[in-house]
Curated annotation (Swiss-Prot):
UniProt subcellular location: Mitochondrion inner membrane
Sequence positions that bind a ubiquinone: 201
Lineage of origin: Eukaryota, Metazoa, Chordata, Craniata, Vertebrata
Subunit-level organization: The cytochrome bc1 complex contains 11 subunits: 3 respiratory subunits (MT-CYB, CYC1 and UQCRFS1), 2 core proteins (UQCRC1 and UQCRC2) and 6 low-molecular weight proteins (UQCRH/QCR6, UQCRB/QCR7, UQCRQ/QCR8, UQCR10/QCR9, UQCR11/QCR10 and a cleavage product of UQCRFS1). This cytochrome bc1 complex then forms a dimer.
Cofactor binding note from Swiss-Prot or TrEMBL: Binds 2 heme b groups non-covalently.
Biological role stated in the UniProt entry: Component of the ubiquinol-cytochrome c reductase complex (complex III or cytochrome b-c1 complex) that is part of the mitochondrial respiratory chain. The b-c1 complex mediates electron transfer from ubiquinol to cytochrome c. Contributes to the generation of a proton gradient across the mitochondrial membrane that is then used for ATP synthesis.
Keywords of the record: Electron transport, Heme, Iron, Membrane, Metal-binding, Mitochondrion, Mitochondrion inner membrane, Respiratory chain, Transmembrane, Transmembrane helix, Transport, Ubiquinone
Positions with a binding annotation for heme b b562: 83, 182
Name of the protein in question: Cytochrome b
Other comment: Heme 1 (or BL or b562) is low-potential and absorbs at about 562 nm, and heme 2 (or BH or b566) is high-potential and absorbs at about 566 nm.
A Gene Ontology biological process term: mitochondrial electron transport, ubiquinol to cytochrome c
Membrane topology: Multi-pass membrane protein
Database matches in SUPFAM superfamilies: a domain/subunit of cytochrome bc1 complex (Ubiquinol-cytochrome c reductase), Transmembrane di-heme cytochromes
Length: 381
């Protein structure tokens, strides 16, 4: 009798995706983040589902309902802390996953890469609307500042902003619709993640060498299931350490005060995972210019496959590109730091230089490095 795993229509899909999937024999721990992201998404959906049972999306009661969850609901404090810090873990894994894709040339699987960028944008949108829900000071003012950027769009901007708000400012209608968005978007993320996997399994995984691995494949189970399990243990360990010992360290103290439209916080800033883009937005004095730079900072990922000039796929054997890659990583850390600082010197000039360097590295220096490495590898005799 044939194995049910290989014949049953549903089991067959699972089998081809997670059990008998041929995987390169040399993929490193940098390939763990896909499965970690899947688990992060499941954690966020489950904890979010239980939070939604007790949350009320009304400006008068939203803040109190979150306090009620933490004080009166059984393990509500744990569910909320896991959800808030789970978002940070999600973005940490996302950034490392994208970084891995850039370093090892995984972006040359164009469909997988483009769906991945759409996924990144959708997760960012989900996190943004979610941050507004507790209706603290930073929630309210963050929502006001970011949605107000829409008004920079010529001609239709103001109408668009008021349409998103459901009124003339961020208010009850905005909170209600943001809760609706925050509930629906994760399921769209799940659908996109399935499409992402579908395209990935059309080509098979890339590997650190960047060389076609077809001649040396091994089954996903048990080799990579056990490897992913180790990654999951570390993920849970870090998440639990964060959620149990220091749950508020990544949040903003202003969010412990209920939203007050009459009192602006001294420094309005988003969560840490948006600070790099926020720094780029603030580095341009013009409002529309800032919005375009903000969009470009993420959408630039879509043109990375077009900027690949090297004869080798991976950066593993390309020291010049490696150096530029790590400068880019350090630059992103710098932008994250600047995004959290007040708008004054020397932070303004550092932010502007870091923003320039970000675009310069991706658009000019890295493609040039690829051409230079091609030249250096050519026989000179």
């Amino acid at each position: 009798m044939t194995n049910l795993r290989k014949t049953h229509p549903l089991m067959k899909i699972i089998n081809h995706s997670f059990i008998d999937l041929p995987a390169p024999s040399n993929i490193s721990a940098w390939w763990n983040f896909g499965s970690l992201l899947g688990v992060c998404l499941i954690i966020q959906i489950l904890t979010g589902f239980f939070l939604a049972m007790h949350y009320t999306s009304d400006t008068l009661t939203a803040f109190s309902s979150v306090a009620h969850i933490c004080r009166d609901v059984n393990y509500g404090w744990l569910i909320r802390n896991l959800h808030a810090n789970g978002a940070s873990m999600f973005f940490m894994c996302l950034f490392l996953h994208v970084g891995r894709g850039i370093y090892y040339g995984s972006y040359l699987y164009k469909e997988t890469w483009n769906i991945g960028v759409i996924l990144l944008l959708t997760v960012m949108a989900t996190a943004f609307v979610g941050y507004v829900l507790p209706w603290g000071q930073m929630s309210f003012w963050g929502a006001t500042v970011i949605t107000n950027l829409l008004s920079a769009i010529p001609y239709i901007g103001t109408t668009l902003a008021e349409w998103i708000w459901g009124g003339f400012a961020v208010d009850k209608a905005t909170l209600t619709r943001f809760f609706a968005f925050h509930f629906i978007l994760p399921f769209i993320v799940v659908a996109l993640a399935i499409v992402h996997l579908l395209f990935l399994h059309e080509t098979g995984s890339n590997n650190p060498s960047g060389i076609n691995p077809d001649s040396d494949k091994i089954p996903f189970h048990p080799y990579y299931t056990i490897k992913d399990a180790l990654g999951l243990v570390l993920l849970f360990l870090i998440l639990l350490l964060l959620a149990l010992f220091s749950p508020d360290s990544l949040g903003d103290p202003d969010n412990f005060s209920p939203a007050n439209p009459l009192n602006t916080p001294p420094h309005i800033k988003p969560e840490w995972y948006f600070l790099f883009a926020y720094a780029i937005l603030r580095s341009i004095p013009n409002k529309l210019g800032g919005v375009l730079a903000l969009l470009a900072s993420i959408l630039i990922l879509l043109i990375i496959p077009l900027l690949h000039t090297a004869n080798q796929r991976s950066m593993k054997f390309r020291p010049v590109s490696q150096t530029l890659f790590w400068i880019l990583a350090a630059n992103l850390v710098t932008l994250t730091w600047i995004g959290g600082q007040p708008v004054e010197q020397p932070f303004i000039i550092i932010g502007q230089l870091a923003s320039m360097l970000y675009f310069l590295l991706i658009l000019v220096l890295m493609p040039l490095a690829g051409l230079f490495e091609n030249y250096m590898l050519k026989p000179k005799w």
